[in-house]
Amino acid sequence: LTPEQVRDEVASGRLVIPANRNHLTKKLDPMAIGRASRTKVNANMGASPVSSGTDEEVDKLKWAERWTADTVMDLSTGGDLDACREAILGESTVPIGTVPIYSMIIGRKIEDLSREIILDTCRHQAEQGVDYFTIHAGVLQEHIPLVRDRVIGIVSRGGSLLAKWMIHHGRQNIMYECWDDICEICREHDVTFSVGDGLRPGGLADASDAAQIGELSTIGHLVERAWRHGVQAMVEGPGHVPVDQIEWNMKLQRRLCHGAPFYVLGPLVTDMFPGYDHITSAIGATMAAYHGASMLCYVTPKEHLGLPKRDDVKQGCVAYRIAAHSADIALGIPGSRDNDDELTKARAALNWQRHFDLSFDPDLARAYHDEDLDVDTDFCAMCGHDWCSVRISKEIQEFASGKTEENAWERSKRSAALNDEQRKILEQRGVLSPEEIHKLAAKKKGKADTKDKATKAACHSDYVDEEEARKIQLAPGETLVELRTEEAHNLPKHDPVI
């Protein structure tokens, strides 16, 4: 993006740059969130009353940055919240967001929340350097009756706490009443709003209901009020949404919230896979980003089950980078597919080292490859030498990817884990037979025994006639299945959505 494009998008409210003036004096590297830029990923972390502490949360921060999280939210509800926040802000290179109400009620009941407590807490966190606040000001008194028919009610911590406050006092949401004063604090320190969705659906059964949409309409009004104060704002979204409702939800938000960047949690597209919700939500996140979301809040395997640990943070970041990257490719974001194409060229050239270097997680890719065949041959353990389609294709014709110097397979390339016996493979390429190569590459001696011809697996390259090839594929008494390849009758000729 050019400087002029960034200025125009920020001025229109379609792009935000969460960068607190006080955080800029530390290690912050500012970034932008909006439809004009690539899709961003947020990682949540924070100590709970029963688990973790400051050191562990700082370690999670570093781990999230390692796995390309674009922002991090500190959602601590236990321990020394102030010290934990200070430590995270001092170490982070990415924008940090918080939910100030968590600090407001430490040591007191939600019913005791007052205007003074709200403004003092927001001011203190802004002075510390927090880059964006999640404020659940869109939950109003008139929305509370709408959740009575829900299966799971209110699943947002901030939303449920403020609903309890309103019922106790018989008054409108105090965050809504204090909105303009909070805006002044944000303007002073350049804190961005992430307007919280306190009535987001917590299950597919509650998706797109009156409570969710009613709050979203109020959020659109709050966004306009923030803009009038010169404060940047993005909007948080659901949650749990069936696949067929995601596009509608994204487009509705853009209309009701005047194009402000949408920041969604998932959404999960099914509720019955606890332990795998980083996958169920990444599916929804990909669709959400394609249809309008600007930032995706990751979900880890621990979602609904417990506090994420270090490896859970990695799993969530990787799943959501896949979702964001996939959407950017589909949207045609310039340069988003470059690495994919380069990796395909390396794969076509059978250049393993470049293949690993271009991958998102080179160490994991190399480990999986070396598990069965820790030598860089012109095939892998999945197919072996004779069944390698890429190798066979290269025998038929030369691909463009194999002609460039950077993708050419260097036969001297080898894994750092090679032993002397395996190193002979690379020294004698073109001399040894495939059987001898397999024997040398075997992790254990005797794994491939070429002397015992009776145990040798039949290979298609050993046969040339059709009758003999069919015998290999058939067990006694069986017949080959002929596939029907005519056009299916129920495929749509035109997709009205597209």
State each model region's role.
Residues C84-R85, E142-H143, D149-S160, K302-A327, ...:
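C-terminal helical cap(s) of enzyme catalytic domains, especially alpha/beta-barrels
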Residues N20, V299, S389-S393:
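Short hydrophobic alpha-helical segments that form membrane-spanning helices or hydrophobic packing faces
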